[in-house]
Regions:
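Alpha-helical transmembrane segments of multi-pass membrane proteins
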Residues: 94-109, 132-152, 172-179, 183, ...
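Re-entrant/interfacial helical elements at transmembrane boundaries that shape
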Residues: 69-70, 83-86, 116-128, 157-167, ...
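Hydrophobic core segments of alpha-helical transmembrane domains in multi-pass membrane transport
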Residues: 1, 19, 65-72, 104-108, ...
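Juxtamembrane helix-boundary/capping and inter-helix hinge elements in multi-pass membrane proteins
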Residues: 41, 76-81, 91-95, 128-138, ...
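Long, contiguous bundles of hydrophobic transmembrane helices that form the permeation core
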Residues: 176-296, 449
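Juxtamembrane and boundary regions of transmembrane helices in multi-pass small-molecule transporters
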Residues: 132-134, 173-218, 395-449
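Hydrophobic alpha-helical transmembrane segments of multi-pass integral membrane proteins
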Residues: 62-68, 91-124, 311-314, 337-375, ...
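Hydrophobic transmembrane alpha-helices of multi-pass solute/ion transporters
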Residues: 1-67, 83-91, 241-313, 329-337
Length: 449
């Protein structure tokens, strides 16, 4: 036992008092340091601080987002994305179509942004409905359950990518943790899809002309599409390279230097660039006119440029929040005890509130990581890995989607459901998935701390 100056042991009350005093001292140091930094930075030119934060964010995620846009666009153009969905359907059959839609959208949600993914897959959902004339709500909700989770938990989509960079989480670690926890979330969403399908009988609302197109799509020869192996390659290659090197490094003695070539291939920018090159080659092999490839890549870059600008603006906004001293203010409201495990539910709630208020899951994640990140002076001092904090923020971006969310309208209009039907089918499912995610995240953080 620890001894006092008179060589007598402390009693339990004295030990608790000593620990409490040390915690208050650490918390005071954090607040003083944050206030000092905010005061120092406030003396600098405001525009310089904004542009510096903007540029730093662009340097972290600019190439990744651009390459992800190229991968997604080229996979759509080449038919690779459709091939993956059809392969899943062929394995499980029409009876297992909900599982096929959920699993394939979960996988495609890694490189393809959710809106594009939904626009691609909803015709296949409708074509499948034509074969059995039932379970339309089940198919639509299952499709959303898969793609929406990887959109918020697995890089290189902007939200989880930005959160991982801000919290200093290795990209491979974020991919592995996001996919693992995302599986539980999507499973809960799929369970809700089966439940709500029994309570909502919605027919397919399409014109005769559209019905004819859907019938043609359902009868499309699979040989017109790329092979499954080639279709999966642009997705699996970066995941394997980035995650593989991360796992390999974690098992090495810290004194051992990894081979430069392996380190290079496992670099996130290199891995995504290689995947983009493969996706472009695949699209070039399927498109009759090479000029079409240039148009698709140009369109991808235009989309990527807009997303990069939004992300960098979010990074600058986050930096301004941190420099405002909001962290110490929130910390003081939470009491004198240093925040640790309570950061996980706090991050979830903060993100969920912001998501419900303004609609965008990505913007909610950008804002929340700035607020929550300002509460922590040393991420390594946490009792759990920072990846769980990143995942908690991602899960918090799921609850309460409604009419202020662009994704809500994409799902509503493209599926043919009314606003009331979409609210009934979508909002509870997304909320359940978010709650499932934070529960699993907290359990995992305890188990692996």
């Amino acid at each position: 036992k620890e001894l006092k100056a008179d060589n007598k042991p402390f009693d339990e009350a004295q030990i608790r008092e000593k620990v409490r005093a040390e915690q208050k001292t650490e918390q005071s140091k954090f607040r003083d340091a944050a206030k000092t930094r905010a005061t120092s930075e406030s003396k600098q030119n405001t525009l310089q601080r904004i542009t510096a934060a903007f540029g730093t964010t662009c340097g972290k995620i600019g190439i990744l987002i651009a390459m992800a846009c190229v991968i997604g666009r080229c996979m759509l153009a080449s038919g690779a994305a459709e091939r993956i969905v059809r392969a899943a359907l062929s394995v499980v059959g029409v009876k297992g179509a909900p599982i096929a839609f959920c699993s394939s959208s979960f996988l495609l949600g890694i490189p393809v942004f959710f809106d594009s993914l939904f626009l691609l897959a909803i015709p296949l959902v409708k074509a499948t409905w034509l074969k059995i004339k039932k379970n339309y709500v089940l198919f639509v909700v299952a499709l959303v359950a898969g793609g929406t989770m990887t959109h918020s938990l697995v890089p290189p989509t902007p939200g989880p990518l930005f959160v991982a960079e801000e919290l200093g989480v290795n990209l491979g670690t974020m991919i592995l943790a996001g996919m693992a926890i995302g599986l539980f979330c999507s499973a809960s969403g799929l369970a809700y899809a089966y439940w709500i399908n029994k309570r909502m009988d919605i027919p397919l609302r399409e014109s005769p002309e559209e019905m004819k197109k859907l019938e043609e799509l359902a009868e499309r020869d699979i040989n017109e599409l790329p092979s499954l192996g080639l279709a999966l390659l642009p997705i699996l290659l970066p995941v394997a390279l980035i995650s593989g090197v991360t796992i390999y490094k974690s098992g090495l003695d810290p004194t051992i230097t990894i081979h430069p070539a392996l380190n290079l291939l496992g670099d996130k920018n290199i891995a995504l660039t290689l995947a983009a090159a493969l996706a472009m080659l695949l699209a070039a092999s399927r498109l009759k006119d090479r000029k079409l490839l240039a148009e698709h890549v140009q369109q991808a870059m235009m989309e990527g440029g807009l997303i990069i600008l939004i992300c960098c603006a979010g990074g600058a906004f986050g930096a301004m929040l941190q420099q405002s001293g909001i962290g110490p203010h929130i910390s003081s409201m939470m009491g004198s005890e240093p925040l640790d495990f309570t950061l996980l539910p706090l991050a979830f709630v903060v993100t969920a509130v912001i998501r419900g208020a303004q609609g965008s899951a990505t913007v909610a994640m950008f804002t929340a990581v700035a607020i929550v990140g300002s509460l922590v002076t040393d991420l390594e001092a946490l009792s759990f890995h920072p990846v769980f904090l990143a995942v908690a923020i991602g899960c918090g971006s799921k609850p309460f989607p409604w009419m202020n969310d662009s994704g809500f309208w994409v799902i509503s209009k493209m599926s043919g459901m009314t606003e009331k039907e979409t609210l009934k089918a979508l909002t509870p499912m997304a909320t359940i998935m978010g709650l499932t995610g934070i529960i699993v995240t907290m359990i995992a953080a305890k188990l692996f701390s």
